[in-house]
């Protein structure tokens, strides 16, 4: 279906139009983005440099850091430019590209979290068979499958949304080209597209949640059968970081995306999207390092090396 007007650009209305808040928000988001950059790239380098971290668990964690950095970078620099220069215009094609990479990488993270849950299940429930269950090739296949699912899902989303007609307005009530905000601008009958996209999003989320739920069900059953307090503590600490990341990630995703557009409050979605697109990528390296002795020890090794240089 062709657009009934030649829409060549969208205008992102941003988080706020209050002039006094533009510079403080620019400073805040620059700080958040720098922490995201340092935290995620630092985690990747740490895993790469320390041979003790060359295991499936940390292979998935390095991919998670890459994805967090990627989808934050798809959004945050444009938001910062809007605060600093008032540059809120985004071309039609740039909007499609931004949405594609954001949806793709967020979906990749979705499947990586499921892969990490399976890895934790194998480590806690079948420790004697862990090295044969989670081989390097199995880890690589799970990671590759996550990327394939992510980019296929994004392709369907972009195809479904940008085949619609845009003739009402080009004012996007958001700070980036998010799916609900752009779809709301369409003057086409978007019921079918919306149902398909909600179905796909629901499938991606609930399939992964089912995998995570089953993995943790077996993990908790195994923990309850353990007789030593040390075993309990080790198993719980192994899973605590991942469980925290899963809870935060899916709580926000379900809140934003699994509602019909008629029930969306754009202002509420904006606040949730800040958390989802910027805060979570910043927090993940912290969550995975605070209670992880192996990461802490690797970091201490790096610091000791720097002292001797």
From Swiss-Prot:
Please provide, in alphabetical order, the Gene Ontology terms of the cellular component aspect for this entry: plasma membrane
Entry-linked Gene3D superfamilies? Rhodopsin 7-helix transmembrane proteins
Main localization of the protein described in the UniProt heading: membrane
Residue numbers on the Cytoplasmic membrane side:
48-55, 119-137, 218-234, 291-309
Membrane topology, as annotated: Multi-pass membrane protein
Instruction: Give the CDD domains listed for this entry.
Output: 7tmA_OR5B-like (cd15407)
User: An example of a Gene Ontology BP annotation on this entry?
Assistant: sensory perception of smell
Q: Which residue ranges does the entry give as Extracellular-facing topology? A: 1-23, 78-98, 157-193, 258-270
Q: Which residues are glycosylated?
A: 3
Question: Which positions form S-S bridges?
Answer: 95-187
What's an example of a GO molecular-function annotation for this chain? G protein-coupled receptor activity
- Residues passing through the membrane, by range: 24-47, 56-77, 99-118, 138-156, 194-217, 235-257, 271-290
Instruction: Say what the protein does.
Output: Odorant receptor.
**Name of the protein this chain belongs to:** Olfactory receptor 5B2
Q: Which organism encodes this protein?
A: Homo sapiens (Human)
């Amino acid at each position: 279906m062709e657009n009934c007007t030649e829409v060549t650009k969208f205008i992102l209305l941003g988080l706020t139009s209050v002039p006094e808040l533009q510079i403080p928000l620019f400073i805040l988001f620059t700080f958040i983005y720098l922490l995201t950059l340092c935290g995620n790239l630092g985690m990747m380098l740490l895993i790469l440099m320390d041979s003790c971290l060359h295991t499936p668990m940390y292979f998935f964690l390095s991919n998670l850091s890459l994805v967090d950095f990627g989808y934050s970078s798809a959004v945050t620099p444009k938001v910062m430019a809007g605060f600093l220069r008032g540059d809120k215009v985004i071309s039609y094609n740039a909007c499609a590209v931004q949405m594609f990479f954001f949806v793709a990488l967020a979906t990749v993270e979705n499947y990586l979290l499921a892969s990490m849950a399976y890895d934790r299940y194998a480590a806690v429930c079948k420790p004697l068979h862990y090295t044969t269950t989670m081989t390097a090739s199995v880890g690589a296949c799970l990671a590759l499958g996550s990327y394939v699912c992510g980019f296929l899902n994004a392709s369907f989303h972009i195809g479904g949304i940008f085949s619609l007609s845009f003739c009402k307005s080009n004012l996007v009530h958001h700070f980036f080209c998010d799916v609900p905000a752009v779809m709301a601008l369409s003057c086409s009958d978007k019921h079918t597209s919306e149902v398909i996209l909600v179905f796909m999003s629901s499938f991606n989320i609930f399939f992964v949640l089912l995998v995570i739920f089953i993995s943790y069900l077996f993990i908790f059953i195994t923990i309850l059968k353990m007789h030593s307090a040390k075993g309990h503590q080790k198993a719980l600490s192994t899973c605590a970081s991942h469980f925290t990341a899963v809870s935060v990630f899916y709580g926000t995703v379900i809140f934003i995306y699994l509602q019909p557009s008629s029930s969306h409050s754009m202002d509420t979605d904006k606040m949730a999207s800040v958390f989802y697109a910027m805060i979570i990528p910043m927090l993940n390296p912290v969550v995975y390092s605070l209670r992880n002795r192996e990461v802490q020890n690797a970091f201490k090794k790096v610091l000791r090396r720097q002292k001797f240089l």
